[in-house]
Curated annotation (Swiss-Prot):
HAMAP family: Sulf_adenylyltr_sub2
Function: With CysN forms the ATP sulfurylase (ATPS) that catalyzes the adenylation of sulfate producing adenosine 5'-phosphosulfate (APS) and diphosphate, the first enzymatic step in sulfur assimilation pathway. APS synthesis involves the formation of a high-energy phosphoric-sulfuric acid anhydride bond driven by GTP hydrolysis by CysN coupled to ATP hydrolysis by CysD.
Protein name: Sulfate adenylyltransferase subunit 2
Nucleotidyltransferase listed as a keyword: yes
Keyword line: ATP-binding, Nucleotide-binding, Nucleotidyltransferase, Transferase
Pathway recorded for this protein: Sulfur metabolism; hydrogen sulfide biosynthesis; sulfite from sulfate: step 1/3
Species whose genome carries this gene: Mycobacterium sp. (strain JLS)
Length: 309
C-alpha cells in the first residue's frame, strides 16, 4: 500500500506578514509580563506609540479586560487633543487610569520648575509613582529606531532600587526568552515595540484602523522657528520678540511636552500619505522634532540612566 501523496503548501501560504510577526512578538511579551510580574503598569500618554501598545495589550487579553492599569506621567503642558484621546480610549475600554502629576511634585517641593520645559522633571514623578503604587514592571512605547540610547536597550530593561539604568549591566536576551528577575524595590521596564520602526507603527495603524489625535495629521497652525525646529504657538510655548509667527500646514511626528515638541511642515492628511512620507524620511521623529534630545550627544542616555522612560 502506498502512502497518499500530500501536496506541499504553496510558498508563503502559512507565513505571517512582517506586521503580523511584530504583532505576535509584542503580544507574547505583554502576556509574558502579565504572567511573570505581580503589579505591571502600561505607560500611556495618548501618543501614537502608546496607543498602539494599548491596542496590542487589549488584543492580548480579549475578550477579558486589561489585567493591569495604565499610567500617564502628566507634565501639565499637554496638547488638548492628546488628553482628549487619552480619556476617550480609557473610557471606551474600561481601563483604570493612574495620573502621576509633575505639578504635585512641584507643589510638594520635590522638584523645582525652572522652565520652560518640564520634561526633565518627569523622571522624579515617574519613579515616585512606581514606588507608591508598588509597580514591578512598566511597559514603555520606546523603539530602537528612535534614538541611539534606545537602540542598545533590551526588551526587558532592569532598573535598580533607584530606578537607574546601567547600559553595561544589561542581561542577555536569547530569542524570546526574557529574564524578569528582580528584588524588592527594583523593577523592569518592558518595551514590546523595540523592534518596530516608525514606518511599521504607521502601517499597523492603517491596517488596524487605529484612531489617533488629529495633530498627527496635516493641519494649519500658527508656528514659529527656534533652533531649527518649528514650534506651535501655545499658552505654554510663546515666541520671543524676535521670532516671527506664521501659519502653515504641519503635523506632529511625535508628541510630548508642548514646550519641547516640534512639528514638521507637511500636507500628509491620511495614513497612506504619512506612510509614503515616512518611507523617504532620513531623520527619526525624535531627532527631527524633540528639543529635549538635543541637550547633548548623550542627552537621552544620561536621562535614562537617571530613570527616564
Amino acid at each position: 500500500m502506498t502512502a497518499a501523496h500530500v501536496a506541499a503548501p504553496e510558498p508563503g501560504q502559512y507565513e505571517l506578514s512582517h506586521l503580523r510577526l511584530l504583532e505576535a512578538e509584542a503580544i507574547h511579551i505583554i502576556r509574558e509580563v502579565a504572567a511573570e510580574f505581580e503589579r505591571p503598569v502600561l505607560l500611556f500618554s495618548g501618543g501614537k506609540d502608546s496607543i498602539v501598545m494599548l491596542h496590542l495589550a487589549i488584543k492580548a487579553f480579549a475578550p477579558a479586560r486589561l489585567p493591569f492599569p495604565v499610567m500617564h506621567v502628566d507634565t501639565g503642558h499637554n496638547f488638548d487633543e492628546v488628553i482628549a484621546t487619552r480619556d476617550r480610549l480609557v473610557a471606551e475600554n474600561g481601563v483604570r487610569l493612574v495620573v502621576a502629576s509633575v505639578q504635585e511634585d512641584i507643589d510638594a517641593g520635590r522638584v523645582v520648575d525652572n522652565g520652560p520645559s518640564r520634561n526633565p522633571l518627569q523622571t522624579v514623578t515617574l519613579l515616585r509613582a512606581i514606588r507608591e503604587n508598588r509597580f514591578d514592571a512598566a511597559f514603555g512605547g520606546a523603539r530602537r529606531d528612535e534614538e541611539k540610547a534606545r537602540a542598545k536597550e533590551r526588551v526587558f530593561s532592569f532598573r535598580d532600587e533607584f530606578g537607574q539604568w546601567d547600559p553595561k549591566a544589561q542581561r542577555p536576551e536569547l530569542w524570546n526568552i526574557y529574564n524578569g528577575r528582580h528584588r524588592k524595590g527594583e523593577h523592569i521596564r518592558v518595551f514590546p515595540l523595540s523592534n518596530w520602526t516608525e514606518y511599521d507603527i504607521w502601517a499597523y495603524i492603517g491596517a488596524e484602523g487605529i484612531t489617533l489625535p488629529g495633530i498627527y495629521y496635516a493641519h494649519t497652525r500658527p508656528v514659529f522657528q527656534r533652533d531649527g525646529m518649528l514650534l506651535a504657538v501655545h499658552p505654554y510655548m510663546q515666541p520671543r520678540d524676535d521670532e516671527e509667527v506664521f501659519e502653515t500646514s504641519v503635523r506632529f511626528r511625535t508628541v510630548g511636552d508642548v514646550t519641547c515638541t516640534g512639528c514638521v511642515e507637511s500636507t500628509a492628511s491620511t495614513v497612506e500619505d504619512i506612510i509614503a512620507e515616512t518611507a523617504v524620511s532620513r531623520l527619526t521623529e525624535r531627532g527631527a522634532t524633540r528639543a529635549d534630545d538635543r541637550i547633548s550627544e548623550a542627552g537621552m542616555e544620561d536621562r535614562k540612566r537617571e530613570g527616564y522612560f
